[in-house]
């Protein structure tokens, strides 16, 4: 079971659907200029072809910046773009199948929402788990109520692999999830809505 440490306390998520009309590549450049070293590319509203082309561009820029690139949901696009890994939800391709396809050099993360899911993912050889939602979130409907930092602390005690906390996390509350044991905090809306994305990333990283 992998114990590979995550390279950054910030797990930035780039979602073109929240870009406020700005080109996704421009936002990516701003994220990297701000110091992002761990990035997930999520593009649920794009066609497969559009997502693939964006992933190829993102791979080149993230490689130059020394930033890990994780593709949301799509093992095929992660492999085709030579991304560093994939993040899977509970209803996506089974972890063991993704591992067989992607091998052990690429990261595989799993979304979890309770203790059993977290333990199952850790036992099934995930490289890290996403856990949440920690706080209320408007980004996407999870079907789960906010878990809070107390539950996050319980998860931290129960699993040894890295934890990425997600759900309603902002610059204002990010230290709460770090203090509760998260190795990294996934932030979407607070970054995507920022007028100055690079400066937002710098401020968040400065808190750690």
Model features per residue range: what roles?
Residues 82, 133-135:
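Active-site beta->alpha loop and helix N-cap motifs at the rims of alpha/beta catalytic domains
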Residues 135-137, 148:
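Short, local alpha-helical segments
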Residues 139-141:
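Glycine/threonine-rich flexible loop motifs
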